[in-house]
Amino acid sequence: MKCPYCKTDNAITYDVEKGMYVCTNCASVIEDSAVDPGPDWRAYNAKDRNEKERVGSPSTPKVHDWGFHTIIGYGRAKDRLKTLKMQRMQNKIRVSPKDKKLVTLLSILNDESSKLELPEHVKETASLIIRKMVETGLTKRIDQYTLIVAALYYSCQVNNIPRHLQEFKVRYSISSSEFWSALKRVQYVANSIPGFRPKIKPAEYIPKILYKLNLPPIIGTKASELVDLMHKQGLTSGKGYLSLSAASVYLISALMDIKKTQKEVADSLDITEVTIRNRYKDIVDNFDIVVTL
């Protein structure tokens, strides 16, 4: 923030006690009596926060009712049995018959995304996709786990999380035909949601490949330049980004005399040598590579 008086950048600070924004360079008061949107209490640990908090958690698409529900407590209840019965009744009426399918799918999604150690924003993206699919009736006649896996894989691509398709297929024993059928439904729904287009690029996979093959960073730099050039020229369309990145790393490592065999590269990434060879051929057929000594 720039001071309107002395025009100094990043010199404005907030005085919490007086509620004023002050310039540290010229001492001008930019604004006084500023409203503090934070809580009216202070907490120094988790216990303090739990005792003083008077509001619930923020809304989230990971829960069928977006988190807007009532929880009946029994900490100070005189009749514990009556309170317990009320809790059970409240839990039953909280989910309407039409929401049962959504509750089941979101429960599976939250469990599996935690097992895969995916970040919260990926879970929320997948939850929004699943909600839209339930609304449009695209969750019928399809295996629930296959649908969840497809939604999580697509959400990783939307949020620039480089996770390979093979990781999901091997973990859940899903056939290629089942997965692509589910992914087709996910893509159909995601196209109707603004901002839900895949943003990931082939170069995102290269750090993982370098780590698994124990290669120096310079190879990653050159391999990234190569796959970025292919991506800009439209040569990556319809090709697996992981295998394309792996082939570029294989080629650059060979040119820099830090050789890795195709088998070593393929085995470290759970892909076939044939895939590496095909992507390698795509690279050398489209580029004239000149090595300057």
Curated annotation (Swiss-Prot):
ZnF TFIIB-type: positions: 1-31
GO molecular-function term, one example from the UniProt record: TBP-class protein binding
Keyword line: Metal-binding, Repeat, Transcription, Transcription regulation, Zinc, Zinc-finger
Binding site for Zn(2+): C3, C6, C23, C26
GO cellular component: transcription preinitiation complex
Induction record: (Microbial infection) At least 4-fold induced following infection by Sulfolobus turreted icosahedral virus 1 (STIV-1) in strain 2-2-12.
Segments annotated as Sequence repeats: 107-193, 204-285
Entry keyword annotation includes Secreted: no
HAMAP family noted in UniProt: TF2B_arch
Family: Belongs to the TFIIB family.
Additional note from the record: Strain 2-2-12 is a substrain of P2 that is highly susceptible to infection by Sulfolobus turreted icosahedral virus 1 (STIV-1).
Biological role stated in the UniProt entry: Stabilizes TBP binding to an archaeal box-A promoter. Also responsible for recruiting RNA polymerase II to the pre-initiation complex (DNA-TBP-TFIIB).
Name the UniProt record assigns to this protein: Transcription initiation factor IIB 2
Protein species of origin: Saccharolobus solfataricus (strain ATCC 35092 / DSM 1617 / JCM 11322 / P2) (Sulfolobus solfataricus)
Lineage of the species this protein comes from: Archaea, Thermoproteota, Thermoprotei, Sulfolobales, Sulfolobaceae
Gene assigned in the entry: tfbB
